């Protein structure tokens, strides 16, 4: 992000302020994505396994409460700049050469139209993509091993807290290093409460996008984003109490 925003003489890469119109369009896009994805889920819900049906019911019952995470974009002017971002940042886009890391595939999320992928965005959206990726790495592996028969349901229940611990620790280490490196940049909120609000919104948006993507391309994988959304609901309820 520091590299992508370093040349303010090139209009294609120069950081830009968020306008009220742009924030409203972000809000509408997020609400539309949630509504479309839930409609697709409900249309196929009857054909899914019992556990997935339960998770979908949980998502539907908390839909309005979850959507409140997007209200920030209507109610408050963002203090950060928007920049040219990766657009689909996750662990699969990061390659280790043996000495350093390389980031690949800057074309953005494949399910989004090109016009949308060309926009400058909040850098925290990429950060949220990485945070979701740590969840995918932990629970995707756990679910695949369970599906193969190497782990039973009891074993899964016993391993789940350890997977969650790894996810939390990895996410914390990544976010801490990111803020230490780029924390003073114009694309990072100086107000940590704003940073949390943005990350909460973008992590939810990413999980909903993943849900729609998996539903259309890899239906057997929808359990991972459903599990992630269930985590979000559980965290919100704990914070509310």
Q: Where in the sequence are the language-model features?
A:
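ATP-dependent phospho-/nucleotidyl transfer catalytic cores
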Residues: 1-86, 97-103, 109-120, 124-125, ...
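Catalytic-loop signature of eukaryotic-like protein kinases
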Residues: 88-94
């Amino acid at each position: 992000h520091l590299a992508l925003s370093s040349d303010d003489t090139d209009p294609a890469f120069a950081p830009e302020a968020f306008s009220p119109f742009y924030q409203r369009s972000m809000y509408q896009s997020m609400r539309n994505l949630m509504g479309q994805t839930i409609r697709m889920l409900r249309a196929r819900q009857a054909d899914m396994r019992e556990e997935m049906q339960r998770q979908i019911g949980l998502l539907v019952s908390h839909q309005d409460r979850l959507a409140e995470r997007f209200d920030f974009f209507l109610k408050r002017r963002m203090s950060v700049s928007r920049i040219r971002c990766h657009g689909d940042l996750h662990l699969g886009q990061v390659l280790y050469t043996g000495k350093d890391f390389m980031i690949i595939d800057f074309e953005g999320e494949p399910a989004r139209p090109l016009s949308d992928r060309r926009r400058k965005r909040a850098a925290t959206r990429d950060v949220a993509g990485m945070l979701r990726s740590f969840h995918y790495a932990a629970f995707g592996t756990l679910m695949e091993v369970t599906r193969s028969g190497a782990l039973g349901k009891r074993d899964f229940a016993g391993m789940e807290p350890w997977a969650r611990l790894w996810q939390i620790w990895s996410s914390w280490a990544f976010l801490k290093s990111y803020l230490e490196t780029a924390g003073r940049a114009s694309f990072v909120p100086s107000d940590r409460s704003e940073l949390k609000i943005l990350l909460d919104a973008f992590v939810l948006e990413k999980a909903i996008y993943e849900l729609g993507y998996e539903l259309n391309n890899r239906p057997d994988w929808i359990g991972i984003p459903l599990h992630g959304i269930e985590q979000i609901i559980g965290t919100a309820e704990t914070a509310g109490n």
